[in-house]
Amino acid sequence: MHFNTLTCVLVGLVAHTSAVPTKREAVNSCLTQAKVPTDAQGSQSWKEDGTAYNLRLPFEPAAIAVPTTVAQVSAAVECGAKHGVAISAKSGGHSYTSLGFGGEDGHLMIELDRMYSVKLAKDGTAKIQPGARLGHVATELWNQGKRALAHGTCPGVGLGGHALHGGYGMVARKHGLTLDLMIGATVVLPTGKVVHCSKTENSDLFWGIRGAGANFGVVVELEFQTFAAPEKITYFDIGLNWDQNTAPQGLYDFQEFGKGMPAEITMQMGVSKNGYSVDGAYIGDEASLRKALQPLVQKFGGVQVTATTVDWMGLVTHFAGAGVNVNPTSASYDAHDNFYASSLAAPALTLAEFKSFVNFVSTTGKSSSHSWWLQMDITGGTYSAVSKPKPSDTAYVHRDTLLLFQFYDSVAATAQYPSDGFNLIKGLRQSISSSLKAGTWGMYANYPDSQIKNDRATEMYWGSNVAKLEAVKAKYDPKNLFRNPQSIKPKA
């Protein structure tokens, strides 16, 4: 009897309070009234748009807006602001920590992949919407005028998040990061107001979106200075038969060559339980590449270099991988993984630091049951375009570092990610970072690490630029509407 009475009381309370709409109901009603297209919860489109790339980190949005115009984006933002619902923009959805969803439940997610226009002007500038995926950007710039942008190699990655937080790829040392080629942008602010920014217009906002772009609003169009697509570009790889004794010196020699290598070379060291290998790209023909690589090949002891010269789209296709669609435009694009990743942007390492790293790889790494891998890119060096700007020139701060590591471990899509994977990836990173001085290293915002807390994350991603970013945040988003667990907070 007491149970029944309590049940009736609870039902009465529920009935009494249900007249007050929840934030979810309120924001969805607002979107409907504003005629903003949305995904109905439980629909096929909700399932497609609402399934995170990283299956380890699923989050449930309060609503999914699917705009096709800037006016609809503006109206959606106004709805989120009106009802106090945090907002996150999702371009391609490839965030390692599901930041397109907000990195937590309950956000208004603005799905931008229906906005993927690429327009090349006669003067070589391009206006591109954030939902354009990198392979589509490359294809359109090539088809419209044999032009190109510096960007990453995965064709399904959306331009928005990629360009607004860095954008490292196979011609970065010659042309810079994707954000280095940005000359302007159109942004929907937290009020719904649409503004333009460049070096001469809202310059503080333009500074902030080049490295920390998710923190201030929804960037609905990006403007770039493109370059003529190389007529000849050569991709290459170098097989290495190293062991625990020879790898430290080999890695050190690779680094030392990288310090002064020509800007035309962009290359990376791959490391896994299977060993070590180099791959990269050279702007030019095979004969010129082999001449440029000769000092490194001699250091490596006469290793075999495999090289192929292609045109720009040949390079894009090669690094996309076999059987991958290099021009994805479908809203039902469906790529997923179940993984944990981290990163390290580091100065030049000593031989002792490489020994520490190799010891970890050869013991804990090799004995692990995990299928981990890592990449060590030489992003800097005397002739690198990435290193030319000062750390304070853009919100992207890692201009003085030489190396960029990406650490990655994945399991089957249906598996529960095992807790020892976190320690493995952390151990790989700390085998290097533990001996580095504070302030000399950081982490890359496009390889976000879900296991670090907010203040530490902002310090790692944006370093000496955090204070200025907090001031810009306070000016443009004082109520912290655009937020996630690792975002910039408004300066008090």
Swiss-Prot record:
PROSITE patterns in alphabetical order: FAD_PCMH
Xref: SUPFAM superfamilies: FAD-binding/transporter-associated domain-like
GO molecular function: FAD binding; oxidoreductase activity
Cofactor: FAD
EC annotation from Swiss-Prot or TrEMBL: 1.1.3.-
Signal sequence extent: 1-19
Covalent cross-link 6-(S-cysteinyl)-8alpha-(pros-histidyl)-FAD (His-Cys), where: 94-154
GO cellular component: extracellular region
Function: Catalyzes the selective oxidation of C1 hydroxyl moieties on chitooligosaccharides with concomitant reduction of molecular oxygen to hydrogen peroxide. This results in the formation of the corresponding lactones, which typically undergo spontaneous hydrolysis. Chitooligosaccharides are homo- or heterooligomers of N-acetylglucosamine (GlcNAc) and D-glucosamine which are linked through beta-1,4-glycosidic bonds. For optimal substrate binding at least 2 GlcNAc units are needed, and chitooligosaccharide oxidase is most efficient on chitobiose, chitotriose and chitotetraose.
Designated name of the protein: Chitooligosaccharide oxidase
Record organism: Gibberella zeae (strain ATCC MYA-4620 / CBS 123657 / FGSC 9075 / NRRL 31084 / PH-1) (Wheat head blight fungus)
Gene: chitO
